[in-house]
């Protein structure tokens, strides 16, 4: 048969299959924009700012609607009430991890982020317990973060108040905290192996937030056959996993079951004590990879965005420094006990996280069983997208949400004001494992920097662009330089 005829027949069959699948599912799922065959709603979604497109859809279809990413449907939850109802009130039913083909290819169903069912519960429980035993949210981890904050300050002094791009320096600090927990040692900020590791993570975040990755995720059949930045992401991930495996092998040589030094030792001991299918060397490497990915680049990007916003709003930086001077002074390091006496600084850090909206659409969830949600039937295994933008930028909770204003988290008396709408770490069963650590790092690193330096922009604040250059998976700030002027 003529190859052209075969191709045409194949395309026709694919179109018919796509049309049938979309029509058979749409009658049961929540309403949404009409999808095109094969490509779904891709052309109706801005790959550079997905959350903006979802907001437009919600204005027409309400807080619960369906979009087709390729041939696969995803139910979108938009607004605080819908997100809370699903992730918190029905936490067990919405606790599944949805499909993210590029990262699924990296994790291979292992680790803590992209696993499901019993394996996920076992690894998450073990990781939380181990991190807690090593002092996560307690004194010993605070000591490590304080030590790293002092190293960060010394590294910033070496810039001699000259213009610098803070990307890698700010990446070193949170990465070293994770290293101390997982490997029992930190790296020098000039260590070539360490800097290469950071470079791989930084590049992967940019790739993950690019429009091309949205295409790869929506059409996973293309991943193995087309060239593109997704290949770099896979190579970078392999490099990091090989680095971790070498560290694991070193730990195996000197393992003392009666004296575990770090996370890797604890995992290896667990492997020896229990013959769990969940606890294997491959699972250990992927779990450590997940902890690095979640605990390094997210905090580093938030710190970078923090400095950019403080340069844009020098009056806010001045007020924070006044509070630091009043509460902490110059002769001791900041500690977590200070936070309760520093409502303005606490409000600024919360507002930074709210404003930058780091992970606009959260990681995908999936329902673990057939469920009726707000009178709609959602079959088991359906992907769920939760718009964190719609919560963090809710106009009722945060008047003028597009404006950076620490007053969003202050009451009339200047006291810190909590908000149920503050969920940059997600919510429910899948809330970020490292939330306590991230909050500690943001407070101690930022207060340490502002205790020792005045931030000086190279351009007028009004000329600084604070718009995210990528807004797909993660909101990535534009590149910028500044001077750290010792005070």
UniProtKB/Swiss-Prot annotation:
Top-level EC class: oxidoreductase
Keyword annotations from UniProtKB, A to Z: Endoplasmic reticulum, Heme, Iron, Membrane, Metal-binding, Microsome, Monooxygenase, Oxidoreductase
Pfam families: p450
Reported cofactor(s): heme
GO cellular component, one term: endoplasmic reticulum membrane
Subcellular location(s) of the protein: Endoplasmic reticulum membrane; Microsome membrane
Binding site for heme: 432
Topology in the lipid bilayer: Peripheral membrane protein
An MF annotation (GO) of this entry: oxidoreductase activity, acting on paired donors, with incorporation or reduction of molecular oxygen, reduced flavin or flavoprotein as one donor, and incorporation of one atom of oxygen
Matching SUPFAM superfamilies: Cytochrome P450
Induction field: By phenobarbital in each tissue with the exception of the kidney.
Location, primary (coarse class): endoplasmic reticulum
PANTHER family in alphabetical order: CYTOCHROME P450 2C9, CYTOCHROME P450 508A4-RELATED
Family as reported in the entry's similarity comment: Belongs to the cytochrome P450 family.
Function as written in the Swiss-Prot or TrEMBL entry: Cytochromes P450 are a group of heme-thiolate monooxygenases. In liver microsomes, this enzyme is involved in an NADPH-dependent electron transport pathway. It oxidizes a variety of structurally unrelated compounds, including steroids, fatty acids, and xenobiotics.
Protein name as annotated: Cytochrome P450 2C16
Lineage: Eukaryota, Metazoa, Chordata, Craniata, Vertebrata
